[in-house]
C-alpha cells in the first residue's frame, strides 16, 4: 500500500530530483512547477535550482545530473558525483524530500537497483528516510495501476519501493494541466516531513557520507600504488 500519514501543512517545500539519465527528471520538475523552468533537451550537466509558488506553497526544485543506467558509482564521473552531493546544499535547511525518478515504461533490474542504491548513498546511509520513488510517463501504465506495475516488475523494484518506506508517486508529464497530480505529490512531501518529526535531510548527514566516500577512494588509490610498486 502507498504510504499515508498525518501531514504538516508547510508554506515552503524543497525537493531534489535524483535518478539515471533520461528518466524524465527535468520534465518532472517542469510539471511540479507548472511551467518550463528546466531544459529538457540534452543532458543536465550541473545542478539547476528553480522556485515558484505552487498550490499556496513556495516550492523549490533542484534538478541534478543523471548517472548512466546500470552504472556502478565507481564508473560515474567524479564531477557528476560532486554535483549529486552538492544538490542538497542548494536547499537551505536541507531538502524536505528527495525523489528517485524512474520511468514507468523502462525495466528495473537488479543491476539498476544496485546503481540507485550506490548513488543515493553518496549522500548518506540515512537518505532513505527522506526519499520517495517518482514514476514518470504515467500515461504508459495503460489500464494497470502503479501497484500492479510495482508487483509485476519484480523483486528489484519492490525492494526500492520498500526501502523508501513504500512512498511513491506517479506523474504524467504529458498532462501539465492536471494540478491534482502535483497537489497530491506535495501532500506526500508534507506527510514525509511529518513522519520525520519535521526534520529535513541535513548537510551534516551528507558531509559525513561524502567524507567516507573520499576516504575510501583514497585508500583504494593507495592500495593500487602499493600493488604497482610491489610488481616493479
Tell where the protein language model's regions lie, with residue ranges.
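C-terminal non-catalytic interaction/localization modules
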Residues: 1-61, 69-79, 90-93, 107-132, ...
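A short beta-strand-to-loop transition that corresponds to the Sensor-1 phosphate-sensing loop
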Residues: 65, 101-104, 135-138
Amino acid at each position: 500500500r502507498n504510504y499515508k500519514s498525518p501531514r504538516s501543512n508547510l508554506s515552503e517545500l524543497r525537493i531534489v530530483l535524483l535518478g539515471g539519465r533520461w528518466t524524465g527528471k527535468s520534465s518532472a520538475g517542469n510539471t511540479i512547477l507548472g511551467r518550463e523552468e528546466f531544459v529538457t533537451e540534452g543532458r543536465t550537466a550541473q545542478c539547476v535550482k528553480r522556485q515558484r509558488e505552487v498550490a499556496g506553497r513556495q516550492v523549490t526544485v533542484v534538478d541534478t545530473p543523471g548517472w548512466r543506467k546500470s552504472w556502478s558509482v565507481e564508473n560515474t564521473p567524479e564531477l557528476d558525483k560532486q554535483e549529486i552531493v552538492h544538490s542538497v546544499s542548494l536547499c537551505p535547511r536541507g531538502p524536505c524530500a528527495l525523489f528517485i525518478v524512474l520511468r514507468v515504461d523502462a525495466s528495473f533490474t537488479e543491476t539498476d537497483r544496485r546503481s540507485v542504491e550506490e548513488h543515493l548513498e553518496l549522500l548518506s546511509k540515512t537518505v532513505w528516510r527522506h526519499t520517495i520513488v517518482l514514476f514518470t510517463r504515467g500515461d504508459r501504465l495503460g489500464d494497470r495501476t502503479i501497484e500492479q506495475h510495482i508487483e509485476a516488475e519484480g523483486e528489484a523494484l519492490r525492494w526500492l519501493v520498500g526501502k523508501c518506506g513504500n512512498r511513491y508517486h506517479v506523474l504524467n508529464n504529458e498532462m501539465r494541466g492536471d494540478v491534482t497530480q502535483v497537489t497530491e505529490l506535495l501532500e506526500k512531501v508534507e506527510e514525509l516531513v511529518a513522519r520525520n518529526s519535521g526534520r529535513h535531510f541535513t548537510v551534516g548527514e551528507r558531509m559525513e557520507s561524502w567524507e567516507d566516500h573520499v576516504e575510501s577512494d583514497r585508500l583504494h588509490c593507495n592500495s593500487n600504488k602499493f600493488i604497482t610498486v610491489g610488481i616493479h
